[in-house]
Amino acid sequence: MEGKVVNLSYEELEAILLTVVSSNPKKEELQNCYNVLKDFKKNINSVEQFLKQIKMNKNDKIRQLAAILLNRKIEKHWPNFNDQIKLEIKKLLLELIRNEKNYLVSKAVQFICLDFENGRVI
């Protein structure tokens, strides 16, 4: 059975990601976060929300997790974006790599940019 596709605001996604990266989350809370993220990633708007977290969040762990989660789903959503949106995403990813001070976050964003057989991202 497929889960529902959910939409999250910046703040809602931030709270979920913070729970996941926190040092001692409760098992039930963590499982709930995983379930919400699983459904959220089905939404094409998740790409924009993950990019916002990577760009704007002050917590390195949240930015890194957002990049990892985006990397896992962008391939699915990429064909649904028009050329202008693809170009904007490419520019933003390059900007994020160029400006990121945290090595692990930068590496996670770089993995998004890796080319694959179908010509994803860059």
Located regions from the model:
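Alpha-helical solenoid scaffolds in large eukaryotic transport, assembly, and signaling factors
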Residues: 2-122
